[in-house]
A protein has these predicted regions:
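Nucleotide-activated chemistry modules centered on ATP-dependent adenylation/adenylyltransferase
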Residues: 1-309
Length: 309
């Protein structure tokens, strides 16, 4: 890694300013969307994917947060999950780890087994089976991450008319074109009894690097260093060509699980041959809505499309 040309004093001044601003965003969110509405803070939760950027967010707010939360998608690299657990333990930060519901796992989705349980569409297959491409990312996000966060909220908010939970997310404006649209809405957004706060909206990658220089105790996730993504979700919707081979080089057990699932999907006959291959989309389709927690995959997808343009 090349040495920084910025002086330690300049780094320290910049990070002090950014840190104060980030905490001010959280203060504003609590004041405007909790206290002003005569609600109580049920929890301040860091959404911790295990990536190096989310680790910086977690380090920044670990002394103010009541919990960290991790969506165990069931289709990710176990080393990242363990990294999240170990990091939270070392900081004394309670971790809430949530999983997909039984019968609605990633495996169930790609095998076409997930059906609506309630409402007018009860019994209807929600996903026909096969692996997702970019246009189907939103379905995977809803099932593997969004519902996990709903469980976190429900754990902490006992009375939504009196309490609100604050989710701290690591969304940044410079990550990608689509996620910049999310950031343009502002760093604070209330959705029902959940207040979403993105304190790093205006941070750049250089700022994140500077934070680590000022705070050398911030840990690193080996998975992120090797794959340039956290690896907590390998749904494959935003996978690039050759990604599974890259995963196999460093984490062969994970790649073997995905390849075994490919064979299972192929044998089931639920999907056309093209969709029996993990990561088949590789930028072929226009992506659908982007999830609040899908930062690294989304940014990498944009970068790869830019290279191909």
């Amino acid at each position: 890694m090349a040495a920084s040309l910025v002086s330690p004093a300049a780094d320290a001044a910049r990070i002090a300013e950014l840190t104060a601003s980030a905490h001010a965003v959280l203060d504003e969110a609590i004041e405007k969307h909790v206290l002003a509405d005569k609600r109580r803070v049920a929890g301040i939760v860091i959404l911790f994917s295990g990536g190096n950027d989310s680790t910086t967010l977690a380090h920044l707010f670990k002394d103010r947060a009541t919990h960290a939360a991790h969506a165990n998608t069931g289709i990710g690299i176990e080393q990242t999950r363990q990294y999240v657990r170990d990091t939270c333990t070392s900081w004394g930060l309670p971790l809430i780890e949530k999983y997909p519901e039984e019968g609605a796992t990633y495996r169930d989705l790609v095998l076409g087994r997930v059906r609506a349980r309630t409402g007018a569409n009860a019994g209807t297959v929600l996903w026909p089976g096969g692996f997702p491409g970019p246009a189907s990312h939103w379905m995977m996000y809803q099932r593997l991450k969004e519902r996990a966060l709903e469980k976190v909220r429900n754990d902490l908010v006992s009375n939504p008319y009196r309490e609100r939970v604050v989710f701290l997310a690591g969304r940044r404006a410079d990550e990608s074109g689509r996620r910049k649209g999310l950031a343009d809405r502002g760093p604070i957004e209330r959705r029902g009894s959940t207040v979403w706060v993105s304190p790093l909206t205006n941070w750049t990658k250089l700022d994140l690097n500077a934070y680590r220089r000022v705070h050398p105790d911030v840990p690193r996730n080996e998975v992120s260093d090797l794959l340039h993504m956290s690896g907590e979700c390998l749904c494959g919707a935003f996978a690039h060509s050759g990604e599974l081979d890259e995963i196999a080089e460093w984490f062969p057990e994970t790649a073997a699980e995905i390849r075994a699932l490919e064979e299972e999907v192929r044998a089931s006959g639920v999907a056309p041959p093209e969709r029996c291959k993990w990561g088949w989309g590789a930028g072929k389709q226009r992506p659908s809505r982007v999830g609040d927690l899908c930062s690294s995959c989304d940014a990498r997808f944009d970068a790869l499309r830019g290279e191909a343009a």
